């Protein structure tokens, strides 16, 4: 049986990448939250 997590850089970029976050209002809200919180990294890649 195949494992559930089959990592792919392209899929990851397209779902949690910076430009994807910037494309929607909620994504921008998320980035601003992380900025306010002082995160070292805004997106997990």
Curated annotation (Swiss-Prot):
Q: Where is the composition biased (Basic residues)?
A: 1-14, 26-45
Q: Where is this region: Disordered?
A: 1-45
KW Signal (keyword) present: no
Q: Which UniProt keywords apply?
A: Ribonucleoprotein, Ribosomal protein
InterPro entries in the cross-refs: Ribosomal_bL34, Ribosomal_bL34_CS
Q: Which residues form a coiled coil?
A: none
GO CC field: ribonucleoprotein complex; ribosome
Q: Does the keyword Ribosomal protein apply?
A: yes
Database matches in PROSITE patterns: RIBOSOMAL_L34 (PS00784)
* Family recorded in the similarity comment: Belongs to the bacterial ribosomal protein bL34 family.
The name this protein carries in UniProt is: Large ribosomal subunit protein bL34
